[in-house]
Amino acid sequence: MTSRKRLVLSYCCLALLLAVLFALSLFWGSVALTPQAVLAALTGRGQDALSVGIITQLRLPRAVMAALLGAALSAAGYLLQTFFANPIAGPFVMGISSGAKLAVALVMVLFLNYGLLTSSAVLILAAFAGAMAAMAFVLAAARRVQRMSILVICGVMIGYICSAITEFVVAFAQDSSIVNLHNWSQGSFSGMTWGNVRTAALVVLPALAAAFCLAKPMAAYQMGEAYARSVGVDGRRFSRLLVLLSSLLAACVTAFAGPISFVGIAVPHLVKQLLGSARPLYVLPGCCLGGAAFCLLCDLIARSLFAPMELSISAVTAVFGAPVVIGLLLRRNREDVR
């Protein structure tokens, strides 16, 4: 099979998988709905107010957010892997998600304790500040270490520190807000509204568009900084853009859904294997489709496996994503031995 045919077939398969999972998200849940009822609700011809409410106010915004944030998280992971030249770099592993989680928890506890309401924009700004602070620590460590394995360990430790401080912060929350904070800190797509969708789209879509515009410089950067400079890529400016975009995407995900593990590592790796190419121009769209489908699948499992009880989304993504990362590490180890 030629590379072009493989790319087209791979994109079609990912798009079909995404469409099927999105449809399943609408009529599969604790309240079973037929495809006819879902179509009637979507087209405004639904007669049952309960079914219409479940579809338009609960399941549809949740499915849209799962797809949107899944695409953002996968793209953020790929940008970080490009920046650090390490296939296991990702928002969760490098501590970026945990830094965003800490900042959001601080803002939520502060606002809730004083009886104030937190807007989506405030949470995104807080998450971005926390993500950038965590990234600053990682970059400071990067200047002192030569081995990428040590840098990854530093990122993991920063994540643990942020998570521990977050637990202390939650301990000072009022009793009425502890449950919401706990559910959010475990990762979940529940409770999404159309207002959340609009705010997230205003952040994620321009950031993804900017990432696509960086595809060609990214390809040069993957060949080495010296080569990138020789073709006119400003290395320092390009690196800053990668850091800003990846942190912004990861922060947006954390602000709305909490920290979600392994999506940013596993999906880019799987997409590259599927496409048979590592070119950013091809991998980035695949990451968006694959990340959206992966998060929709994990969300379906999280809310359906033990319904009406709902699992945290991170627990499900870890079950599927961790084996991929383990396989990647074993493969790299075999290559190093050779």
Language model: regions and residue ranges:
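Alpha-helical transmembrane segments in inner-membrane proteins
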Residues: 1-338
